[in-house]
Amino acid sequence: MKRFVIGILAHVDAGKTTMSEAILYETGKLKKMGRVDNRDAFLDTFALERARGITIFSKQAVFPLGDTFVTLLDTPGHVDFSAEMERTLQVLDYAVLIVSGADGVQGHTETLWRLLRRYRIPVFIFVNKMDQKGTDRDAVLASLKERLDHGVVDFSGVIGNEDVLTFSASAEPFAAVCRDPEEAAEEIATCDEVLLEAYLADGTLKTDDVRKVIHDRKLFPCFFGSALKLSGVREFLTALGEFATCPDYTKDFGA
């Protein structure tokens, strides 16, 4: 049975717990999404968390993703509980960094990024709250590249369910409109020298090679949407299932 562990991280009020709820709902683990402001979020189990509307303790849930079981860890977003968040990083295979499309990259976002770099954790990025007025998708993406890493790439419409990467127009309302497949492929290829050489040789990107570049923290897939409205969540989950790799544990691995 294949398994891997993801952690949901964010600056405060980016919608981290709402994203966790959306993931569990979309994968059939919840019949109804809870809301932080309604004090009925599934993963906010302590009375103090529900009263204050913040996550204080890391929580765990397991959901199916194709033929893989994914363990999700919802971590505190408030800077006062950073020690609790950092404690979970040591067990993660991948991190999902939530950024508010309304607020953009915050100081705490950069702190989280430095911690993820220190622990060498591969990262998927979800830009949330894109349904709010005044959000600028291109500006947020440019800020992510400038303040976090130039390897942050918009993965709207990128498909990895075949041996070779393919591209299609995304149906998500906050995805890029009419992206040029060749331009998208080149942006991915330039994140790694070996990947670029292979792409220049035959004009294709092998999906396994892209998975490796993501795992090696040279490429950071980025998605846009609204967790509260379930926009972009399904596309993100599909990509997570296609591009995340399960760790190889030996038979004698255990606590």
Walk through the language-model features, giving the residues of each.
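Structural and coupling elements of P-loop NTPases
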Residues: M1-A255
